[in-house]
Each structure stands twice: as structure tokens, then as C-alpha cells.
Amino acid sequence: MDAPWAREQLRRRYLFPSEVELDCEDEAKPETPTAVEKKERPLPRLNIHSGFWILASIVVTYYVDFFKTFKENFHTNSWFLFGGALLFVSLSIAFYCIVYLEWYRGIEEYDVKYPTLVPITTATFIAAGICFNLALWNVWSFFTPLLLFTQFMGVVMFISLLG
């Protein structure tokens, strides 16, 4: 690679494509790919990664009696109520963004128009996760974050299969 060519490429790296075309009219343009080459095959929804998390979530639910434990400890700890309220707020904002703003109003980039919605949703969801960890800590001890994260990933991967 010769030095003048490298300097010229370095100089052109921040130019807009139209400026680059004007700058190098004498150079030959590479062929543009056809529509068939541009069209990429969509990724399959069910892959090894999502299958693993869904299966792991099912195994965790079965072996730790997740729903039975949740039902027995629901009324004994106030962290469940606080975590549930935060989770409700987080999911409400998410549904507001997806259903109302994107589907009904047609705002595709709602995160640009309303930049505080995504951080608020994320913060409330993380706070809800911390509350659920505190509520179930006396049951599973240091396994609680691992079990809840596995459940979370299983739900996320299952939802990704649906849509």
C-alpha cells in the first residue's frame, strides 16, 4: 500500500458519498449489487440460543417449584408488592410506546421524540428486578439472581418467537 493513496483514503473517510463521487469522477465506480444480492435471508426465530434459554427457563421453573414458591411467599414480603408495582409501571410504559405511539399514532422513532421513556422504563424494570431478588432471597439465597435472570431470558426469548 503506497503512502499517497493511504493519505487520500484517510482524507476522504469523513466525506459524504456525493462529495466522494465528485472528488473522484475519473476513477472507475465498482458495480452496484443487484436487488437479488441485496436481499438477505431473514434469521430464523428459533435458534440454538433462544432454544437454550427457553429450555433452561422451563427446567428452572420445574425443579425449583417457581410458581409454588412465588405463591407461598407473595403475601409474606412487601418487596413483592413494590416490585410488582414497578414492573407494572415498566410494562405500562412499554405498552404505551409499542401499542399507542408506534401502532396507533404511527410514530416509528418514539425514542427520538420522547427520549426519556426508554431510560425510565429501563430503570423501573431494573428496580423491579432488584425488589424481586430481595423478596426471594430468603428462599434461594445467592441462587436467586441466577434463577430470576434465567426466567427473564426464557420469557424474552419466548416473546421473540411470537413476534
Curated annotation (Swiss-Prot):
Question: Which superkingdom heads the taxonomic lineage of this protein's source?
Answer: Eukaryota
**Where in the cell is the protein located?**
Membrane
Q: Which UniProt keywords apply?
A: Membrane, Transmembrane, Transmembrane helix
**Record-linked Pfam families:** TMEM128 (PF20479)
Does the entry feature the keyword Membrane, yes or no? yes
Can you quote a single GO CC term? membrane
What transmembrane ranges does the database entry give? 47-67, 79-99, 117-137, 142-162
Q: Topology with regard to the membrane?
A: Multi-pass membrane protein
What is the protein's name according to its record?
Transmembrane protein 128
Name the source organism: Mus musculus
Gene behind this protein: Tmem128
